Structures are given as structure tokens and as C-alpha cells.
Swiss-Prot record:
The protein, known as: Delta-1-pyrroline-5-carboxylate synthase 1
Binding site for ATP: 196-197, 202-207, 236-242
Domain of life: Eukaryota
Taxonomic lineage of the native organism: Eukaryota, Viridiplantae, Streptophyta, Embryophyta, Tracheophyta
The gene coding this protein: P5CS1
Entry EC number(s): 2.7.2.11, 1.2.1.41
Region (Glutamate 5-kinase): 1-296
Induction comment from the UniProt entry of this chain: Induced by salt, drought and cold stresses, and abscisic acid (ABA).
GO MF annotations, alphabetized: ATP binding; glutamate 5-kinase activity; glutamate-5-semialdehyde dehydrogenase activity
Tagged with keyword NADP: yes
Keyword Cytoplasm applies: no
GO cellular component: cytoplasm
Length: 716
């Protein structure tokens, strides 16, 4: 479960929750009931009911469902001539009367399947004018909740006397949003959740790229800046009505969250304290600072600064990197001190050893990082390089040149050294950068960010590299596809997979590092031992560490293999066996071949030959880095040609799969994708291309006056 956001900590005390379901959530585009969404809603209510929450539903949708049904009945009962006549709009009250029974029948059926009882309560605004009605309503609901029955409210539109625009002079309620707010007050709810067809309240129409979600509504800050779009496609008031109801309810003491009824398990996420949707709370103005800089503003500022950086000469950009390297070494003691505080806190918090290992800045690491930055600085300037030059026609020359991508977002867990690597690569490639690190490395990241940005000259601006330390969730950053050009996740399989599934922004990275070493029957076993020990023990938490050792079946009982296995055990490596190795050597059975240990553990299995090894790698590997140890060059070439991984080695440790070791300078990460960049990615992975055409007034004019030559020209 995600950690509770500080602004949502009140959910720990929530017992009674009212959930209002909008028509757009209950129904599909064609007006029919959205069975999947309603079913998912009922499953969440069931789970809450089982956990001891008191859940009250307020549902819309009767009018829409009834209208669809009556239109169908009218269609099947009409002649062709009738259908040619102007069609009168169906009476909304009749639609409500027909739709309500169908809507409740669905709820009743779904809840029965979940072994939950539900009840229907239809009300009108005039009912609430009677104090005795209110008293009886409360008693009835209390009785239902005591019996763990789900009360389902809806306005009785079939007999309501209110006319458009649906706001009565009494101001009791005017739609189901305001009904939900009224019930929250009457029934003393601890929380009101308004489910919509959008993620929450935006600063403008959600379809506009410039609109940003508002996670905590503050009247003084947001009332004037919000621009509402169209109202709901099927309901009465859309977001305007929800905000009005939310403000009234929250001012009366009931917190309100507006969130999407389309998102998976959104209700449970709200009650787990996740920062989704928009929160309305009477104390919100005490939490949020109006001076907070949004991540969107940080991204825009980073792009502006990157353009200043690109305007510098190659030597000026080189000097910035050299200054950064010097600054890191000059501040090593301070950096190590802050990192040690992070490591100590992680150990006290009980973090797993692999994460603590990745978090730790070991002695010599700062010097190593500074060296890689200087190597990067002394490499050929990657920006504005002419990659191709073509004479399109006489005096019409086309150049394909390298240029920065724009603004990068790196989301990383624990690894503070990743911040340094990415920052230096961003500077060298002329890109702006946003950094979102894990809370476990907050002190390390903060000091590293300060040291680096202090070395950036004023004519570029320290906002070139932004460190996101606000409570913004990763999900919010991933929605900034109009201002962020590439996401680079550095962390767990779960983190990378979630990011790839949650954004329109291109993602560069790998979800798994399941690297193999295959020992062929002709291998030099002393060499194999040397390679295997390095691949597993040198840095077990690294993504290029060996996770599976494949061995030719002829070596099963060989002294050389015994020597390797004993050496691994002596170093403290836990060995697990595949089906064959488990049976033959008695190792504990591996849970799965597709498993990244990231620790002192590995899987061993036997294969028939090199092709079997290749098939195993393709089936269970992650296309990261795989190695063969053999003295048979023909077998080696077969392995090198056929293994479809980002990096494939012969007689060399998988630990060589690294940008610095490849001579790329610092490393942005390792990509197992096939588009844009693959394998260890250096500065070239942060570049794109553009076309520059130089002419002398030529025009196309239907190609009448152009003689195309398309002749390749020297680059210089």
C-alpha cells in the first residue's frame, strides 16, 4: 500500500463515508449501464464494508438509463413514417421512473453476488423541509448501517417539482452532488467522495495541455484561476456542481475528494491516503503554501535554462562540467556526511539490504563520479554535430544535425549517484532536467543537487536542474507530456513497469536485469570461475549482476563446476536450482527463472547445448546483458549473433555492461527497448535530430523549376 500523504492523514480516522457516483461513471457513451465500472464500484464497497467502514451510496444515472430504454421502446413501436417526423424530447420524469428500477436492479444483483445487502432511498428536496423527515431519515440509515446494509440514495426525479436550472430558492439541494453534500452533513459522514469521469479538479478544461490537476483546493488560491469547461455529457452540472457541493460540505466540516470513477480502485486509494483527485478541506489553507513552485513551472524553467545552455560555446559547456567535477570533490566530506545520515535512517526503518547498498555512497565513489564527468567533458561536443549533408538541388543544401531532446525527467530510487550521472549528461547534451528521488535519499539528493547547481553559471541559471521535493506524486509528473520530453526511471521492476504503463511521455529504461552467464562444455573453467565470481559478487545489487548461471549438461559432475559452486557458497551466495539442478545437485528449488535477486543469490540450471541456453535466455531473460564462456569460437559466434539482448559478451563479465566502462562517460541508464537507444546509454541517448535547409530563394511551385540531385556531400 502506498504511504499516506500528509495532507490526507485524516483518512485514518474515517469510519463513515458517502460515495456519490455520477451519471458519466454509471453509464456508457451510448447510455447503457457501464457494467464493468459499476461492478468494480460494488467490489470496492464490499471491501470497505468488510473492513468495518460504514458506506452510503448516492447514485445518479436513472434518467440516462431510462431515456435509453424509452428511446429503444419508441423506436421498435414506431412506423417508418413516424420516424421521419420531428422527434420530441422524452419526458425526463418518465425517464427517471423507468430507469430507477433498472438501476437499482443492477445494484441489487451485483451486491447479492458479493453477499452484501443494499437498500433504496428516494428523496426530493422538499422532503428535507420537514424536520421530522430528517430525524426519521437519520434513524433509518443508522439502522441499515448497523445491519451492514448499503443505503443507496437517489433524488426522486420522477416526482420532483423543481425546474431547470435546478437550483431552488430554498437552497436545500439541486442535484445529486449537492444531495450528497447535504447527506454528509445530516448523517455526520467523515468523508465524501464524488466520483467523476475526470481525475479531479483541473485549473482549466482537462483536455487542454496547459491545465494541471489541483490536489488540494484552496479558495483564496484557486477560485479565480480555475476555468471550467463543458458540463457533464449526461449529468446536470458537471465539475461546477461538484465544486460547489464540495465547498459547502467541506466548510461544514466534512472533507471531500473529487476523483475519477474510471480509475482502478480509486475509492480504496482515497481511503489509503494516496494523493489522488482533489481534496476539499476546511483547513486546507493551513497546509499548502501559495508560494510553492509547481512541477510544471519547474519544467518550463528548465527548458528556458537549457536554451541558454545551448547558446554557449562548446568550451563554455565543457567548463561547467569541469567545475561540477571539482565541486563534487571539494564537498565530498559534506556529501558523505549527508549520505551516512540517509543510510542510518534507512537501516533504522528496516529497508532491505539491496536498497541500502544502492543508497550508500562508498569511499572512492565521489572521485569515480568526478573522473567520469571529466571524461564526459573532454569528449567531442555532441550538440549541433552534422550527421548527414545532402545537396537536394543546386544551391539547396540539407543538413541533419544533432540537438537536445528538451526536458528530461528522471525518477529514481535510492541511487544518489544516478543524480550525478544524469545531471552531468543533461549538461553535456544541453537538456533541462527534473529529478524525482526517493524519500530514503532525500538528504543525499538535496546536497548533491545544491553542489551541482551552485556550479552552473548565472547566464544559464540554476533552474536548469530541478529537484522535485514537493508532495507531488510520480503520477502527476507523468501527466506533463507537453513540457517533459523523456522519462528515465532508475529503480525497481515495479517502479519502471508502473511508469511505462502510466504516461504518454517516451520512457527509456529497463524493468528487469536478469543477466545470464552460460558456461559451455569447452569453457576454460578457471576463466569461467573468475567471470562468474565477478558477475555475481562484485556488486550483487547492480542491474548487470549475474542472476542465472546456465551450465552445459556435460559439466554437471565436473570438478571445475564444483569449484565454482563451492566458491560462490564460500562467499555467501545462496544458490537455487532449476528443475534439473534441483534434482541433480539438491539445491533449493528456484521460485522462478524470471527473478532478479539483486542480492547474494543466484539460480543455477543445466542446458543441453548453446541453442538450449539461447532459448532459455529468450524465454526467461530481460534482454539486458548475457554472456557465454567458451573456447570454441564457432559456438561463441552463434551465441553472440542469436541472443537478442541489449549487450552480449564472450568471455567477459556482465559487469562490463556500463556506460563508463564502455567509454560513454557517465551513464543515463541501460535500455532494453528497441527504439531510440539500447544497452548502456550515454550522452547520445539524450539527443535527437533536426533538419536544416539552406537555400537561395527556391520554391517548390509544383516542382516545375527544381532539378533534384540528392547528392551526398562531405560533412565538413
Amino acid at each position: 500500500m502506498a504511504s499516506v500523504d500528509p495532507s490526507r492523514s485524516f483518512v485514518r480516522d474515517v469510519k463513515r463515508v458517502i460515495i456519490k457516483v455520477g451519471t458519466a461513471v454509471v453509464s456508457r457513451q451510448d447510455g447503457r449501464l457501464a457494467l464493468g465500472r459499476v461492478g468494480a464500484l460494488c467490489e470496492q464497497v464490499k471491501e470497505l464494508n468488510s473492513l468495518g467502514y460504514e458506506v452510503i451510496l448516492v447514485t445518479s444515472g436513472a434518467v440516462g438509463v431510462g431515456r435509453q430504454r424509452l428511446r429503444y421502446r419508441k423506436l421498435v413501436n414506431s412506423s417508418f413514417a413516424d420516424l421521419q417526423k420531428p422527434q420530441m424530447e422524452l419526458d425526463g420524469k418518465a425517464c427517471a421512473a423507468v430507469g430507477q428500477s433498472g438501476l437499482m436492479a443492477l445494484y441489487d444483483m451485483l451486491f447479492n453476488q458479493l453477499d452484501v445487502s443494499s437498500s433504496q432511498l428516494l428523496v426530493t428536496d422538499s422532503d428535507f423541509e420537514n424536520p421530522k423527515f430528517r430525524e426519521q431519515l437519520t434513524e433509518t440509515v443508522e439502522s441499515l448501517l448497523d445491519l451492514k446494509v448499503i443505503p443507496i440514495f437517489n433524488e426522486n426525479d420522477a416526482i420532483s417539482t423543481r425546474k431547470a436550472p435546478y437550483e431552488d430558492s430554498s437552497g436545500i439541494f439541486w442535484d445529486n452532488d449537492s444531495l450528497a453534500g447535504l447527506l454528509a452533513l445530516e448523517l455526520k459522514a467523515d468523508l465524501l467522495i464524488l466520483l467523476s469521469d475526470v481525475d479531479g479538479l483541473y485549473s482549466g478544461p482537462p483536455s487542454e495541455p496547459s491545465s494541471k490537476i489541483i490536489h488540494t483546493y484552496i479558495k483564496e488560491k484557486h477560485q479565480q484561476e480555475i476555468t471550467f469547461g463543458d458540463k457533464s455529457r449526461v449529468g446536470r452540472g458537471g465539475m461546477t456542481a461538484k465544486v460547489k457541493a464540495a465547498v459547502l460540505a467541506s466548510n461544514s466540516g466534512t472533507p471531500v475528494v473529487i476523483t475519477s470513477g474510471f480509475e482502478n480502485r480509486s475509492i480504496l486509494k482515497v481511503l489509503h491516503g494516496e494523493k489522488i483527485g482533489t481534496l476539499f478541506h476546511k483547513n486546507a489553507n493551513l497546509w499548502e503554501s501559495s508560494k510553492d513552485v509547481s512541477t510544471r513551472e519547474m519544467a518550463v524553467a528548465a527548458r528556458d535554462c537549457s536554451r541558454h545552455l545551448q547558446n554557449l560555446s562548446s568550451e563554455e559547456r565543457k567548463k561547467i562540467l569541469l567545475d561540477v567535477a571539482d565541486a563534487l570533490e571539494a564537498n565530498e566530506d559534506l556529501i558523505r556526511s549527508e549520505n551516512e545520515a540517509d543510510v542510518a535512517a534507512a537501516q533504522v526503518a528496516g529497508y532491505e539490504k539491496p536498497l541500502v547498498a544502492r543508497l550508500t555512497i562508498k569511499p572512492g565513489k565521489i572521485a569515480s563520479l568526478a573522473k567520469s564527468i571529466r571524461t564526459l567533458a573532454n569528449m567531442e561536443d555532441p550538440i549541433n554535430q552534422i550527421l548527414k549533408k545532402t545537396e537536394v538541388a543546386d544551391d539547396l543544401v540539407l543538413e541533419k544535425t544533432s540537438c537536445p531532446l528538451g526536458v528530461l525527467l528522471i525518477v529514481f530510487e535510492s541511487r544518489p549517484d544516478a543524480l550525478v550521472q544524469i545531471a552531468s549528461l543533461a549538461i553535456r547534451s544541453g537538456n533541462g532536467l527534473l529529478l524525482k528521488g526517493g524519500k530514503e535519499a532525500i538528504r543525499s539528493n538535496t546536497i548533491l543537487h545544491k553542489v551541482i547547481t551552485d556550479a552552473i553559471p548565472r547566464n544559464v541559471g540554476e533552474k536548469l536542474i530541478g529537484l522535485v521535493t514537493t508532495r507531488d506524486e510520480i503520477a502527476d509528473l507523468l501527466k506533463l507530456d507537453d513540457v517533459i520530453d523523456l522519462v528515465i526511471p532508475r529503480g525497481s521492476n515495479k517502479l519502471v513497469s508502473q511508469i511505462k504503463a502510466s504516461t504518454k511521455i517516451p520512457v527509456l529504461g529497463h524493468a528487469d536485469g536478469i543477466c545470464h552467464v552460460y558456461i559451455d562444455k569447452s569453457a576454460d573453467m578457471d576463466m569461467a570461475k573468475h567471470i562468474v565470481m565477478d558477475a555475481k559478487i562484485d556488486y550483487p545489487a547492480a542491474c548487470n549482476a549475474m542472476e542465472t548461471l546456465l551450465v552445459h549438461k556435460d559439466l554437471m559432475k565436473s570438478p571445475g563446476l564444483d569449484d565454482i559452486l563451492v566458491a560462490l557458497k564460500t562467499e555467501g551466495v545462496n544458490i537455487y536450482g532449476g528443475p534439473i539442478a534441483h534434482k541433480a545437485l539438491g539445491f533449493p528449488k528456484a521460485v522462478s527463472f524470471h527473478h532478479e535477486y539483486s542480492s547474494m543469490a543466484c539460480t543455477v540450471e543445466f542446458v543441453d547445448d548453446v541453442q538450449s541456453a539461447i532459448d532459455h535466455i529468450h524465454r526467461y531473460g530481460s534482454a539486458h546483458t548475457d554472456c557465454i564462456v567458451t573456447t570454441d569460437d564457432k559456438v561463441a559466434e552463434t551465441f553472440l549473433r542469436r541472443v537478442d539482448s541489449a549487450a552480449v559478451f564472450h568471455n567477459a563479465s556482465t559487469r562490463f555492461s556500463d556506460g563508463a566502462r564502455f567509454g560513454l562517460g557517465a551513464e543515463v541508464g541501460i535500455s532494453t527497448g528497441r527504439i531510440h537507444a539500447r544497452g548502456p546509454v550515454g550522452v547520445e541517448g539524450l539527443l535527437t535530430t533536426r533538419w536544416i535547409l539552406r537555400g537561395r530563394g527556391q520554391v517548390v511551385n509544383g516542382d516545375k523549376d527544381v532539378v533534384y540531385t540528392h547528392k551526398s556531400l562531405p560533412l565538413q
